[in-house]
Amino acid sequence: MSSAFISLVKRISSQRRCLLLALGAAATMVACGIQDTSDQSMEADEPWNWSDEFVRSAVDQVRAGRDLNPDSWPGGARVAVLLSYDVDNETVQGLRTGNISIGPLSQGQYGSRVALPRVVKLMNEQGVPSTFFFPAWSLKLAPEQADLIQESGMHEIAAHGWIHELNTALDGPTEERLLRQAVDAIEEITGTRPVGYRAPSWNHSPNTLRIVRDIGFLYESSLMADDRPYELVQNGEPTGMVELPVEWILDDAPLFNPRGNSYMNPRDVMQVWIDEFDKAWEEGTMFLLTMHPHVIGHRSRIIALEGLIEHMKSRDGVWFGTHEAAARWVRKQAGMD
């Protein structure tokens, strides 16, 4: 990272710095308490006055490197299906912000009490290995979730932060301390050290990738530079870190918001996901879907997931795997091991 970039970031106020790190992520802006500053003077940090060096340094912090999509997936399959569940529960219903309210917390408990068992039952019945990303506190509050997931022996539990904290608003030492705490807590409860990481709110601070590499994760799954697996590049340096990219249209939360204006009929959502899968199958790449038990696990919504799985199973050459299995496969095929 260039000295010009570091010095300018240090001069930016805490709110503006948070805005810079969020770079348009609405959820992050709200959590940081930032108002729209488009009509305010930003003096030296006005983007149109930034130097070439600064812009390139900012953009090059974390970029997509080489394409890691293999010629084929395990068993000669043409497409990989990776189903993932961010088991946020109470953490995203108030704990992450400190805005404690009993009603929203009850929605979080629905995740562990009703929705997760419903989801795991479906995955087990369909024989679909899946990856469950936990903020550590979601697991600490209901550790029985680990037994439920691990009983079949085919699913993966991975890390999703400590308390679904806004990592982009934290200094480096705090972000690292919380993630190391999370990894240790998940290992203590599950008996297995997580090898995968998904950042809360799908965003990186300038420190996140360094921390993830230092901890020794096998893969990362928070960014959106492709819809195929790729290697992360940090400040121009190939990292050897596999990115399994995500995408908002392949996330249940923004589509099923009954209190907002983005709610979609579950059968319409199913068709969107089917179309995404069909194109991935046609291209011979990867279909990665992110869901949340407390969202997809409601009765009317899990119908969309049931229909999607039925459709995917009707096609030839489909491999269902955990994120860990996919990451290990692409590393091997790319000669990274």
Annotated model-derived regions:
Residues Q35-A44:
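C-terminal segment of N-terminal export signals and the immediately downstream linker at the start
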Residues H294:
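Substrate-binding clefts and catalytic carboxylate motifs of secreted carbohydrate-active enzymes
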Residues E43-G196, S201-L244, R267-L289, G297-D337:
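Catalytic alpha-helical scaffold of carbohydrate-active enzymes acting on polysaccharides/glycoconjugates
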Residues M1-S14:
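N-terminal secretory signal peptides that target proteins for export/translocation
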